[in-house]
Structures are given as C-alpha cells and as structure tokens.
Amino acid sequence: MHFEEHFVRLEALARKLFLAPLSVTRAELRKRISEQLRSEGFSPNTANAVTVRCYSDGAVEIECLDILYNSFALRALHPQAYLCRLSGSLLTENTSAKEAMLELNRTMGQVADEGVALWADEQGEVLAIDGSPVVAVFEDEIRFSRVGSGVEFDLAYNAVKAMGRNVIKEEICLRDLAKAKELLYIDHRGISAVSKFGESVYMDIIAEKVADNIE
C-alpha cells in the first residue's frame, strides 16, 4: 500500500492547493482507511484500491475499490494514444479539475476510437498519458519524464535503477517519440504500455521486466 509515501504526497498537495495541512493525521487516516475496508467487507487477500479525496473545507472522503490485479502489474490493456494540447501544469496534479479533463478526454477517445489522451504543452513537452506520468524506452536509455510524479512512478524508477539500466529523469518531447521503442504510463492501476501513437508502433518488453522488479 505504501501508505507513508502516499500520505506525504497528499499532505504536500493540500498545502499547495489549499495553503493548509491535511485535517487528519497519519494515524487518523490510516485508522479510517482500515476501518472502512473492514466495514465494507474487503478481503485482505485481494488487491484493494483506496482513493482519498480532500476538500478545501477540510473534509476527507475515502472510497475503497476491490481490484483484480496487482497495482504494479503490466496491464493487459495496450491502448493507442492521441494528442491533446494543454497549457498549465495544474492539470497534471491529482485534482478535481484533472479528473474532469480526464473524463472528457476518455469520452472523446471512446467516441472517436482513438484510445487515451497524450497530454503535451505548447512547447511539445509530454506531460502525461491518460493523466499518468510517462516513461519512454529508447535504444540506449530509459527516460522518466521530469514532470512525472507519484509513488508508483518513483517505485518504477528505483526498480529500473536496480536492474542496472541506463535511466534518467529528463524532458520527453513529442519529437522524441518517433525514436522510442516503448511508451509507458504508470499509476495506481499498474504499468500501461501504449501500442501506437501517430505512425509509431511500440513494444512492451521492458515494461514487463519493470513490472516484475517493482517491490
């Protein structure tokens, strides 16, 4: 679950957006999550996804979901991606504005059968895919997006370093994607490998190895 890492990120985001700390302590939030999982009958033998929503008035809402896969597995879904231009970095944070944009993009992608949205800024830097941080695999290096963040993203970065691969955190631009061998995005749902973007077709060989090595 990596509760401590998630709590630190949640606290930092609350201070950034609301200019105030969370209204609950570590111990209180951990207890509330445990009690809600137990009261809703979630089994400790299956993977459970927990969403914590914090509001400007200090309210904290917890939603528990039973999922069928390991959070750090390579997902069976291999979508194609389409380009969506964004201005401003706030939509890459886990906010209600981001969720609204994601819902719109996903609906558009389904209607047009275009897959998931690849967000890029006006300068061509790739910000996210389906709202999640991006990794591009090249012939000689594995590049984690410099604007990417998240507990799972950091775990994947450490896993690649432990594998002895040449890994860097640097800008990923649209012009780089034609040279990439694999194009991935990582979040609590797991590691997702894009199958196609534009004229480029991608593999998932390294993605599977990374998933196997995340602790």
Predicted segment positions?
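Helix-start/capping segments and mature chain N-termini
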Residues: M1-E35, S39, Y55-E215
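Ordered, amphipathic secondary-structure segments that act as subunit-interaction surfaces
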Residues: S43-T51, E61
